[in-house]
Structures are given as structure tokens and as C-alpha cells.
């Protein structure tokens, strides 16, 4: 399955520390390999069509993604600082998901 990365997500990932980037790449590789079957602790469904890729470490990194047209799309990334997903981050991911649906 192909993985498409939003340019903003790519910038976000490349700005992280090298060690964290390696963990992100490893986790994205797991997503590519296991697709829908990838579950906790690496992936969690957060809404009907939106999933959260969870990268644990010195920083808690979250990447929102979806499955669309037999591909995986990485929509948004952020550093998680609290227990709940910030609404601002969720809204942005849902907006990008909506854009995919209109294409």
C-alpha cells in the first residue's frame, strides 16, 4: 500500500530530533506492513475515518492518518503534551481528510 505524506507533515517530521525521526520512520513502516491490522500501542482509531499513529519516546509524537483509495495518507503531525487530543489538531486533520474526499 502506498503512503502519501502531506508536505506539512513532512516538514514536521524533518524538524524532529534524529532519534525521534528514526522512531517515526520505524512506526510508519509498521503501518505500511500491517495497514488496518496495526493496533495499540502504535495506532488508535480517533473518529470514523481518522486514525492516530502513536510514537512514544522523549517526545510523544502523533500523526493523524487515513485510508483513502487503497492508500495511506499522513494528514497532520504534532507533539502531544496532554492526555487529550487538542481540538485544534483534530480540526486540522479533519479538514485535510475532507479535502481528500473532494479530490
Where are the regions a protein language model picked out?
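Short, conserved beta-strand/beta-arch hydrophobic-aromatic motifs that form part
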Residues: 62-63, 76
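Basic, Lys/Arg-enriched alpha-helical interface segments
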Residues: 1-59, 71-72, 81-103
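Short glycine/proline-enriched loop/turn "hinge" motifs that connect secondary-structure elements
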Residues: 57, 64-67
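Active-site beta-strand-loop-beta-strand hairpin of nuclease catalytic cores
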Residues: 66-74
Amino acid at each position: 500500500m502506498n503512503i502519501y505524506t502531506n508536505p506539512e507533515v513532512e516538514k514536521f517530521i524533518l524538524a524532529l530530533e534524529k532519534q525521534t525521526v528514526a522512531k517515526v520512520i520505524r512506526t510508519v513502516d509498521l503501518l505500511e506492513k500491517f495497514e488496518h491490522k496495526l493496533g495499540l500501542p502504535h495506532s488508535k482509531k480517533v473518529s470514523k475515518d481518522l486514525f492516530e499513529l502513536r510514537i512514544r519516546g522523549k517526545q510523544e509524537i502523533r500523526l493523524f492518518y487515513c485510508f483513502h483509495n487503497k492508500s495511506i495518507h499522513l494528514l497532520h503531525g504534532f507533539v502531544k503534551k496532554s492526555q487529550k487530543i487538542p481540538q485544534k489538531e483534530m480540526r486540522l486533520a479533519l479538514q485535510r481528510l475532507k479535502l481528500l474526499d473532494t479530490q
